[in-house]
């Protein structure tokens, strides 16, 4: 009898454990569906906004434009930026599709990752200045500016670009973002660190999931598809490496990933 009770007790625990696990999986799927719907809504907005602007500028110019040629040129420049924005969204969607279908291919070459980071920082300097955020690089802890790695330059450039761009988007007035390099013998550790608004601890485990948004109030004025960090994670992992995040709300965030040194 005691043995039967033990078996029944064990079976009951197993069933309860299975029920709890199933409940967690269902909740996870529900949240994913919620995030997916929100993503599609955001995507529609992110595409419509620049397209309507482009259409407005082009119609004005087709009707003869304005007398001031400087304004006409400004219209063309804004339309060009709108096209770049739409192109960026389409490229993100194409990339995440390739990742999910395991069709992502790397074109690996020898890359000086410090020089690559400098290029990315310089390309985002004007945006950072508009938000009164300073950008800097610290390679001294790695011992050299000549840090060669074998990687896909465009893909790692996208990783750095996304991380630095996010740091600017969620930075604070008179804030600072720094890209740091550390020598780990066989690997190089790269950090993108800021003193911005930070992230609540409860959000960190899901931060790299597709469609996941930390807080609507945070992202309302930033835009984007919500795929950026998911893409970053996949691109780093495609190089056989890992990415991590440390963050404290109100104190800033540090994203770090490794690359194999040559």
Segments predicted by a language model, with ranges:
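Short acidic helix/loop segment immediately C-terminal to the autophosphorylated histidine
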Residues: 62-70
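Conserved glycine-rich
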Residues: 240-241
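Short conserved segment of the HATPase_c
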Residues: 199-213, 233
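Short alpha-helical segment of the dimerization/phosphotransfer core of two-component systems
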Residues: 81-89
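Conserved micro-motifs of the catalytic ATP-binding
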Residues: 101-106, 144-151
């Amino acid at each position: 009898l005691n043995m039967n009770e033990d078996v029944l007790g064990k079976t009951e625990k197993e069933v309860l454990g299975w029920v709890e696990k199933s409940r967690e999986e269902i909740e996870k799927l529900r949240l994913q569906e919620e995030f997916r719907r929100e993503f599609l809504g955001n995507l529609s907005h992110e595409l419509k906004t620049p397209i309507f602007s482009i259409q407005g500028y082009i119609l004005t110019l087709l009707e003869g434009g304005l007398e001031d040629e400087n304004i006409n040129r400004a219209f063309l420049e804004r339309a060009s930026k709108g096209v770049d924005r739409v192109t960026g969204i389409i490229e993100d969607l194409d990339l995440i599709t390739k990742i999910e279908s395991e069709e992502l291919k790397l074109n690996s070459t020898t890359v000086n990752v410090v020089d690559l980071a400098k290029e990315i920082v310089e390309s985002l300097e004007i945006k950072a200045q508009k938000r009164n955020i300073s950008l800097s690089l610290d390679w001294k802890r790695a011992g050299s500016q000549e840090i060669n790695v074998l990687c896909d330059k465009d893909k790692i450039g996208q990783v750095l670009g996304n991380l630095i761009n996010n740091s600017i988007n969620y930075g604070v007035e008179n804030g600072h973002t720094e890209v740091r390099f550390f020598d780990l013998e066989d690997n190089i550790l790269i950090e993108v660190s800021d003193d911005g608004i930070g992230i609540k601890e409860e959000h960190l485990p899901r931060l790299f999931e597709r469609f996941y948004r930390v807080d609507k109030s945070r992202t309302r004025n930033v835009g984007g598809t919500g795929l950026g960090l998911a893409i970053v994670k996949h691109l780093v992992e495609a190089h056989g490496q890992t990415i991590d995040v440390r963050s404290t709300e109100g104190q800033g965030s540090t994203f770090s990933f490794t690359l194999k040194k040559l």
